[in-house]
Amino acid sequence: MTQETTSLYEDIHALLQEAPGAEQGVFLARLEHTLTDGYARALVLEAERVRLERRMDELTEGLRDDPADAPTDELATIARKLSDADSELSRLRGTLARLRARARAIRSAA
C-alpha cells in the first residue's frame, strides 16, 4: 500500500469517527472531497487490474506455443499482484460505502 493510500484510509477513518459539529457544510465538503479521492484511487486499482489481466493473458497465450518455456516467475508475480489489487479494491469499496452512508445520513439530518 502506498503512502497516499494509507493517508486516504486515515482520512476516511477520521471522518467516520469525527462529529460534524456546527459547520456541517464544511464537514460534508471534506467528506465529498475524500470520497472523490477514494473513487479516484479505486479507478487506479481497476486500471491496474486490467493491465495485469492483459499481461497474464499474453503470458498464458504463449504457453500454448511452448509450454516448456513458461515464465512461471512472472506469472506468479502477476497473480500475486492481481490478488493484492483485488483485496485492496474490495477493502476500499467497503470503506467508501461506509463513508458514503455517513454523508447520506448527515445530509438527511440537516
What would you call each of these model-derived segments?
Residues R49-L75:
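Extended alpha-helical coiled-coil "stalk/arm" regions
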Residues E61, L89-A110:
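Long amphipathic alpha-helical coiled-coil segments
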Residues Y9-T36, D66, R107-A110:
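Short, charge-rich amphipathic alpha-helices with coiled-coil/heptad character
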Residues M1-E10:
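Eukaryotic long, low-complexity intrinsically disordered regulatory regions enriched in serine/proline
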